[in-house]
């Protein structure tokens, strides 16, 4: 694991290099795609990107949690969370790279 974080600027640079758009156009395209994904999730829609992953908003019910330092129980209110489920193709690619590095 490299510990490197890929940012929006990195994505825009990659689009610029690989597609041939200007950096400004590439950055706008990345923002548009991320905005569409965000808007869909806010509306409660599932976002499925074939061969990559599925993003989905799901509801978590109220539950009792515990403060790990004090051990005191505290209620955790119901909330909505975003889940990410990697596609099998992506999982396999990651596994293949990991196995190749082990050799």
Swiss-Prot record:
Q: Which InterPro entries match?
A: Hist_DNA-bd, IHF-like_DNA-bd_dom_sf, IHF_alpha
Q: Name one GO biological process term.
A: positive regulation of metabolic process
Q: Name one GO cellular component term.
A: cytosol
What Gene Ontology terms describe what this protein does at the molecular function level? DNA binding; structural constituent of chromatin
**Superkingdom as given in the UniProt entry:** Bacteria
Gene3D superfamilies in alphabetical order: IHF-like DNA-binding proteins (4.10.520.10)
Return the Pfam families for the record: Bac_DNA_binding
Keyword annotations: DNA recombination, DNA-binding, Transcription, Transcription regulation, Translation regulation
* PANTHER family the UniProt entry points to: DNA-BINDING PROTEIN HU, INTEGRATION HOST FACTOR SUBUNIT ALPHA
What this protein is reported to do is described as:
This protein is one of the two subunits of integration host factor, a specific DNA-binding protein that functions in genetic recombination as well as in transcriptional and translational control.
- Quaternary arrangement and interactors, per the entry? Heterodimer of an alpha and a beta chain.
Q: Which family does it belong to?
A: Belongs to the bacterial histone-like protein family.
Q: What is this protein called?
A: Integration host factor subunit alpha
Gene source species: Bartonella bacilliformis (strain ATCC 35685 / KC583 / Herrer 020/F12,63)
Gene assigned in the entry: ihfA
